[in-house]
């Protein structure tokens, strides 16, 4: 079995779309022996601090044990602790340390961003001639081109180090403050500006590459791939998904479209030397949670459960085990193992920091902040007393 981790995961912080709690996601990933997990909520990073704190707590005992082993290693090497067979003891301790380090669970901080088709500041009402829907038939299914500024293309963006985390925060924040139009959006100009320390995956059928493929714009898809490769280099991956619906009341159109996209992505991967990864676009934890998630989608779209025309998911979007993902992608094992390559690229880093307190200038005649505070405290106290 190829080792695997999930890189495309939505929690309850993907508001009215994700149904999974962060503790449940992390607990299942750890139980299954996964070495890490990414959190990529839609357009936001609301859950990142909870995710960080939870994983930090779960890793606490193991990290303390590693520190204890390291202290013994240093003591033996320096001669502070004498042992009968120094080399044998050090080798044993190094082995113990390696086993402990292998137990550390790595959080990957990310976001499934929306990338504007033009600039993030473009928010005009779309002209009628552009707004008119164009339909393309692909493998018997209708693919629609939407309004030019509507929502944006999906893109999975992961921070591989602290610099990347800061850049991701900038991109997401700017998407809300400057790029919001139906959704918080970034654009390619911003991605190029803040690309350092980021890993990017091409996302689901809502991504630019899949959409271009499904509308017959193969040249445009290839040009977009080469743009991302030029900016992100070895940190750009083409993302495969396979959601074959197995129950009647589910979206059965998605899987054939994914297969069309996957075939092209594999072709582009070989042609341009871009690595593949597989994901499951996780929205809930267990298979049996699909019905609860279905009802959540009814709430978010304002539709009745028995509406024949309402939005449906494939009901395959649970946090699948490594074995389940191996069964689905057995023909492309590199797409499984490359998820571990991304995990190895991601550094351990802390997003904790001390409180950021405001700084107020103190008039020179008061000297110190303490003297300034004392003067006004006494004055206000006196006023209260009289």
Indicate residue ranges for each PLM-predicted region.
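Phosphodiester-processing cores and adjacent nucleic acid-binding clamps
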Residues: 1-386
């Amino acid at each position: 079995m190829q080792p695997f981790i999930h890189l495309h995961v939505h929690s309850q912080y993907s508001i009215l779309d994700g149904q999974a709690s962060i503790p449940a996601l992390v607990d299942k990933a750890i139980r299954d022996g996964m070495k890490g997990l990414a959190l990529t909520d839609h357009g936001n990073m609301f859950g990142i601090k909870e995710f960080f704190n939870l994983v930090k707590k779960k890793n606490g005992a193991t990290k303390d044990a590693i520190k204890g082993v390291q202290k013994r290693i240093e003591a033996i090497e320096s001669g502070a602790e004498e042992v009968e067979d120094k080399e044998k003891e050090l080798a044993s301790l190094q082995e113990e340390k390696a086993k402990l380090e292998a137990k550390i669970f790595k959080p990957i901080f990310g976001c499934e961003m929306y990338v504007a088709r033009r600039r993030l500041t473009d928010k005009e009402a779309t002209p009628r001639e552009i707004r008119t829907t164009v339909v393309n038939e692909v493998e018997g299914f209708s693919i629609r081109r939407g309004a030019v500024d509507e929502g944006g293309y999906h893109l999975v963006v992961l921070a591989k180090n602290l610099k990347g985390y800061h850049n991701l925060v900038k991109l997401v924040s700017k998407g809300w403050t400057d790029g919001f139009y139906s959704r918080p959006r970034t654009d390619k100009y911003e991605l190029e500006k803040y690309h350092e320390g980021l890993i990017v995956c091409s996302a689901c059928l809502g991504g630019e590459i899949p959409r271009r493929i499904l509308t017959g714009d193969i040249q445009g898809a290839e040009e977009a791939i080469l743009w991302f490769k030029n900016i992100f280099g070895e940190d750009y991956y083409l993302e495969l998904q396979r959601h074959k619906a197995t129950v009647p009341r589910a979206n059965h159109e998605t899987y054939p479209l994914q297969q069309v996209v996957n075939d092209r992505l594999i072709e582009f991967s070989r042609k341009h030397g871009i690595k593949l990864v597989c994901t499951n676009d996780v929205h809930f934890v267990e298979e049996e949670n699909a019905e609860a998630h279905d009802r959540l989608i009814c709430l978010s779209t304002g539709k009745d459960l028995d509406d024949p025309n309402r939005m449906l998911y494939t009901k395959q979007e649970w946090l699948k085990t490594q074995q389940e993902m191996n069964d689905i992608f057995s023909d492309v094992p590199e797409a499984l193992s490359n998820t571990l390559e991304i995990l190895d690229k991601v550094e351990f880093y802390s997003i904790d920091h001390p409180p950021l307190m405001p700084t107020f200038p103190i008039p020179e005649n008061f000297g110190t902040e303490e003297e300034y505070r004392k003067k006004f405290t006494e004055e206000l106290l006196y006023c209260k007393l009289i």
